[in-house]
Amino acid sequence: MNSENNWNFPYLPATAAEREAMLKDIGVRAFDDLVSHIPGDVRLKTLDMQEGLSEMELSSVLSDLAAKNKPASRQSSFLGGGSYRRFVPAVVPSIISRSEFSTAYTPYQPEVSQGSLQAIYEFQTAICLITGMDVANASMYDGPTACAEAAMMAVRLTGRKKIVITGGVNPEHRMVTETYANTCKIGLNMLPADKGVTCHSDLKNQLDTDVACVIVQYPNFFGAVEELDKLAAEVHAHGALMVVISDPVSLGLLAAPGDLGADIVVGDAQSCGNFLSFGGPSAGYMACRKDFIRQLPGRLAGMTTDNRGQKAFTLTLQTREQHIRRAHATSNICTNQALNALAMLVYLTCLGPQGLKELATISMQRAHYLAEKLCQIDGVKRTFDSPFFNEFAITLPASVDAAVVLNELKERGILGGIDLSANADNSGCHAPQLKNAVLIAVTEMNSVAELDKYAEVLSEVLSSKTLKNTAKKVLTV
């Protein structure tokens, strides 16, 4: 491998001369002789690839490909549904890119890395502060898996075998939880959300002694703010647990779920210091009441004193199957989201409580401003009348098709939202019962000028005769 003939090819595993020498020592003339006993129709075929490029040529090709992208930063984006475009201060990537944090894996002697453990401890503290809960873990993979793990945690705590999910829960959370439940032979019931929020009488009819937990999103997928306290009272009256999914930014303004009766709170860290990045990576968070700490999945960092009386951080509970017997483990949740959790911590620390409140207020005020502007357009109305945070649904006139309208907006530089009646992916629809409805999200990144432009362009698009003719064709097909 260190032949004088390949000194300028240090990354090649073997040069042509070295391969020839090895074949000669083996006693065959060519590589094909080594695999001659393998039928030709099952052998790997030679890939039809072009000649290799120099670094300069490759850089040019990749730049040309990247130029074809249409990132949200070059458009007016009103997409939401779980991933939100928010401003990330430069200090966030600066800190998480430090070599002390940006490592390949957790140290196998974690107490050596006191800085990393302190960061995890501070992350847990921040999560407890915004959720109003007693204890939080070191992070989860993302929001959907945190939701599923919370459901499994509730099953272990109650010994019951049924989960109720309200209709306002994000479809991705619901599908991941359903996957977990089906594998574990746990029943899963879906509550409708015909008016955008959970119906109390429908919930009461679903509750019985077999229900382990009820999962509610706050604000929910449609942006509506659920009445958590009333729902929690009903859930607890039947001996079940209340699992709440929350966008952390909304908690800068809304009452903490823990103060409204939540037993377990989960969510996604994407909106706090993490970029959209084509949908990932992100991190999930999970917090619960102190009584449930032994069933909390993942890792927990704690603070104690060492044998010299100095403050020290340590991993206090690690009920993962990597650390204890599988039969006693709470989950197999890994550690690879720690860097994204750190980004959330840095983001929240930079904002502080007042900054988070101001950020949430701006998002809410601008969302309400846009909703009012859009509803002034003939034929456009809010789909639900429920109070909302920074996300809301509108219903377009029956004479047009939502997918066509959104495509027209995109052609004009506006990502107008999510078509709630469209097939989100091969596994199911976002909300097929909501015909011609669009889900719109607003953050601090959407200026008032952008909001005015959205309303202006949507009005133009809806008044277009060409659009209406196209919509008729779409509806006829």
Regions picked out by a protein language model, each given a short descriptive name:
Residues C272-D378, R382-D385:
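Active-site C-terminal subdomain of aminotransferase-like
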Residues M1-L23:
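Charged, compositionally biased N-terminal leader segments and the immediate start
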Residues A14, S36-E122:
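N-terminal entrance/gating region of PLP-dependent enzymes' catalytic architecture
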Residues M1-N2, R98-P110, A126-M133, T158-G159, ...:
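Gly-rich Lys/Arg/Thr-decorated short loops/hinges at beta-loop-alpha junctions or inter-strand turns
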Residues Y108-V112, S116, C128-A148:
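Short loop-beta-helix segment that forms the pyridoxal 5′-phosphate
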Residues E18-K24, T125, N426-V477:
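PLP-dependent enzyme catalytic core of the Aspartate aminotransferase-like
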Residues Q354-Y454:
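Conserved C-terminal alpha-helix-loop-beta "cap" of PLP-dependent enzymes
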Residues T145-T314, G379, I394, A403-L409, ...:
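Conserved PLP-enzyme active-site core in the AAT-like
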